[in-house]
Every structure is written in structure tokens, then in C-alpha cells.
């Protein structure tokens, strides 16, 4: 699984003009499942998002995590992160998990966040046309992955 996280002062996501998810200080996580992902990747990615140290300490170094500080997480499903853009002028979404699998893994990711988070967890709606608003803090943006385990003996 893939996520792009952005540190934010506040963020919200709308569907059909209605706010469906909103947080104050925290992280926006754009989330995508790819072929071969399973619940282990969704849970590992949730752990990484919550534990990734992107918030400044008293000396200005990135030493605080959303988990440490009780910050919120706004999770937004975004299959376009799996795009293959290596050739041509049109992205290919072949690497993305099929919609049914993607939705199930997004829900597993959300459940894992909610089980572990010390702050609020909000989300967008899988498969919906969403409008995301955020106040980027920094800006601080990272690409995180929880790749599928390679096939073969363990």
C-alpha cells in the first residue's frame, strides 16, 4: 500500500458539497492499495502513518508523531497514487488494486488507525468525487509504503 502524508493545520473533505471528514492539526493521508496488498500492509501502513515523526519538538526537529501528540488523521482514498507514468502522456492504473479490494483495504487501514490513534480519525468516501481542503504546514509531505511481501520461502 501507498500513502502520501501531509502535515496540516486543518483539513476537511467534502462529498456533494457536504463535509464528511474534518480534522484540526494533524496529517492528511492519501491512501492507495496496489496488487498484492492485504490486511497486513493496511495495518503496517496505519502504524507508519501514526508513528512517523513529522511534528517539530521544542528545538524545531521532527521528533513528534501524530500518535505522540494526539493529532488527527484525515484518510482519503486515492487510487491514482498507483499510476504508472513511465511512458506516454496518459497514466495507466494497472498497478492499482481492483475497486472491491481497494475499498476493503482502505476500511482495514481506517480500522487500524482508529484502534491505535490518540487523536481524531476522519475519512473521505471510497469511490466518491471528493474535494479536499487543507492548510499545509511546512509544507511537510512524505511518500510512505508498506509493500507486499515477495513470494517465496520466508
Swiss-Prot record:
It is an enzyme of class 3 (hydrolase). Its EC number is 3.1.1.96. The keyword Endoplasmic reticulum does not apply. GO terms for cellular component: cytoplasm. HAMAP family: Deacylase_Dtd (MF_00518). Disulfide bonds: none annotated. Homodimer. Its main location: cytoplasm. Pfam families: Tyr_Deacylase. An aminoacyl-tRNA editing enzyme that deacylates mischarged D-aminoacyl-tRNAs. Also deacylates mischarged glycyl-tRNA(Ala), protecting cells against glycine mischarging by AlaRS. Acts via tRNA-based rather than protein-based catalysis; rejects L-amino acids rather than detecting D-amino acids in the active site. By recycling D-aminoacyl-tRNA to D-amino acids and free tRNA molecules, this enzyme counteracts the toxicity associated with the formation of D-aminoacyl-tRNA entities in vivo and helps enforce protein L-homochirality. It comes from Halorhodospira halophila (strain DSM 244 / SL1). GO terms for biological process: D-amino acid catabolic process. It is found in: Cytoplasm. This is D-aminoacyl-tRNA deacylase. GO terms for molecular function: D-tyrosyl-tRNA(Tyr) deacylase activity; Gly-tRNA(Ala) deacylase activity; Ser(Gly)-tRNA(Ala) hydrolase activity; tRNA binding. Keywords: Cytoplasm, Hydrolase, RNA-binding, tRNA-binding. A Gly-cisPro motif from one monomer fits into the active site of the other monomer to allow specific chiral rejection of L-amino acids. It catalyses: glycyl-tRNA(Ala) + H2O = tRNA(Ala) + glycine + H(+); a D-aminoacyl-tRNA + H2O = a tRNA + a D-alpha-amino acid + H(+). Belongs to the DTD family.
